[in-house]
Amino acid sequence: MKQIFVVYETDAWHSTSHRDCAGVFTSKWAAVNAIVKNHRIELDEFFDDEEIEKTSKRVLEAEVRRRLRKELEFAYQTQGYETNYDIEVWNINEWYLAKY
C-alpha cells in the first residue's frame, strides 16, 4: 500500500469551507518541508513587537521554521494561527496504481 500526503491550507478554525489544497507529497517529511518553507503565517503570530524589533528577520524566520517543524513532528496539523495547515494521509492500494 502506498501513501500520499495531502497538505491543505485552512483558516484558524480548520473549517472545510475555507480549505485549499496546497500540495500533494509522497512522504510526511516532504509535506512538512513544504509547509515550513512556504507557510503564510506572519511573524507577529509567533513573537511580540519588541522581539521583532530587536532580532533580525533571518533569525526570527529560522525560529519560526524550527517551531513549525517541531509542531508538525507528531501532529498532522498546525493550531493557533490565522492560517493553519492540515496534512491528510491517503492510503492507495497497489492494484489501483497498476490499473491506472
What is each model feature region?
Residues 17, 33, 97:
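Short acidic, gly/pro-rich beta-turn/loop elements at beta-sheet edges
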